[in-house]
């Protein structure tokens, strides 16, 4: 039987001679009590690459590795991603790479700075403490903080309880391309500058399909025409495909230009709350389909609550069909702005007149069934 030796940090572990003991405990990663410590054992024949968290190389001998005794759930602090500790992109990515074959990665409360896109692998669940788990993204323009490591075939993963801040113009929090059958739960996105998006999903043959969003929020920087979009589901990559068959339940969107920009079909938006947006739902065709033989999309909006959405529904092509029902609409200028009311249904208990829009009445857009020959 061996004694369990203890050291303060991972750096001390690397300097510890395994001949003295093959069982070792660290009190922290960079300092005692920082949450990145744990129990390790010495694998004398192991030559696996050092990943900075689960497998650690010794400075005393080239052969053998210290291996963390894992309880199943990984913690980003085990890889040196500590709150308020500067740029922790590399440490975050090492923790995500440790989930290449699936796994659960915990992001505890704190402020984390990320400066490059993070790649998430198939079967990974990333979860935190909600508003308190702050990921501040300063990555390059035209990139997203959270990305699928593999796009073809599409991958399934899950995110929950994270608060992502976007600090670079023309960038995004979640880049959904390549994600299908995935879950997004209790997420917060703060868009801190203009022309940014929260949940961004163009196609290029890898459109996001069959995903479920529950209690996912987005807030913008405010101001007129800030160019920010919460659910940005347009066909930017190739002008043909956009997200299809996704479901959004609940969530609060405020202080940005467009709450939902949708160019896909079969998406369901249920019980959302929108405040202070220029456009609530913008339905359009991908630009390369305007002259295509096959036209048309159809999406549903149910149980909508809005305050001060200038245009609640905007139909930008006459074949963008919608079925919508609102529970509360106030402070808007136009309830529906569209190219055609045919083959659409809109039920609302409120008129389209300012200032308060509280007169109750029955409202329906005419519906004519399609005729097939």
Predicted regions and their residues:
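Glycine-rich, low-complexity segments
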Residues: 1-10, 63-77, 346, 351-373
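Acidic Gly/Asp/Thr-rich repetitive segments characteristic of extracellular carbohydrate-active
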Residues: 1-21, 76-108
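N-terminal extracellular ligand-recognition/capping segment immediately after the signal peptide
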Residues: 4-11, 28-41, 101-125, 129-141, ...
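Short, surface-exposed terminal/edge motifs of secreted or surface/virion proteins that either
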Residues: 22-73
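Right-handed parallel beta-helix/beta-spiral solenoid domain characteristic of secreted/periplasmic
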Residues: 70-90, 125-172
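Right-handed parallel beta-helix
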Residues: 123, 127-132, 153-166, 180-191, ...
